[in-house]
Each structure stands twice: as structure tokens, then as C-alpha cells.
């Protein structure tokens, strides 16, 4: 098992421990997974608080990569519009996040944690959206891509905030909101002409 696989495994273990309401201990995890503890300590050498941010970062990055690979396979030969491809990717991302909603709420329960998580995930999601637009066939220059990614990221954050802060909201409602929001944004012809 290589270091990337170990990191992904540890991040998954961390998120799953939150979902199950179990405590998380790297020493116990190393025994459970039969991985040398010194390797795990080398990969995650920081304080527990910093390591938790790293687990979240790795977990989200893995989700993003899986979504991009799935989208690339599904849309490669599809005759869908640029809008439909972006919308589909957002739907898939929110369906995946909904599975981990409880863990994400717990990780963002304190205001200071919410800010740190926001900063990490905002930057990471911006990169995800840039890759997604390229995957969907966007050929605009990098500057324009960044403007579009910032706009799309703001829609993502708005809907993620609703998902995590409103207990009664359903994934169907989030998807309906995303559809409406994206349609408004795609009406900006100087940005979205694809």
C-alpha cells in the first residue's frame, strides 16, 4: 500500500468514526489496519487539530477526484450541453456530500472550525470546478475560467451552507435550488457561451 492509499484510508476512517460516533485514535487505527504506526505518524505528524483538517482535506479531495473521473467517463460520448454536464456534476457532488452530512455538520459545529473548514474546502472546490469545466469541454482562457469558477463556487457554497444548516432540507430541494441558480448564472452570455 502506498502513502496516498494510506492517507485516503485514514481520512475515510476518520469520517466514518464521526458518522458512527466513535472516538478516533491513530494508534488504534494503525493496529486495526495493520499499518506501521511510524508511517502513519510520519504522514500525519501534526497536532490532532491540524491532522483533522488534513483528514477533511484528503477526504474531500478523494470525493472530488472520484466525481471528476465518473463525470469524464459518463459524459465523454454524451451529447449533453455544457450546462447539463455542470449541473450533473453538482448533483453527484451533493449526493455524495449528503451521505456524509452528519459528519460535516459535526466538523463545522464550532464557529472557528467552520471558518477553517470553509477556507480549506473553498479553495479545494475552486480547483475542482476549474477541472470540471475543462472536463466538460470549456476552452476559455484561465482568467475567464477563474471568474466562472468563482461564480459557480459561490453557488456551491450557498447550497452547501443550506444543506449543512437546515435539518429539514432534502437533497431534492438542494438539487432544485442548484438547477435554478445555475440557470440564472448561465444566462450571463459574456461568461457562458458554451
Where on the chain are the PLM-derived regions?
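C-terminal peripheral helix-coil segments that are non-catalytic and often amphipathic
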Residues: 165-194
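Hydrophobic alpha-helical segments that form the core
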Residues: 143-164, 178-184
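Short, amphipathic alpha-helix enriched in basic
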Residues: 2-37, 45-52, 56
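Short, basic, alpha-helical segments at the C-terminal edge of helix-turn-helix-like DNA-binding modules
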Residues: 56-68
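Amphipathic alpha-helical packing segments from all-alpha helical-bundle domains
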Residues: 114-138, 147-154
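Amphipathic alpha-helical segments used for helix-helix packing
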Residues: 96-116, 133
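Hydrophobic alpha-helical connector segments
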Residues: 71-102
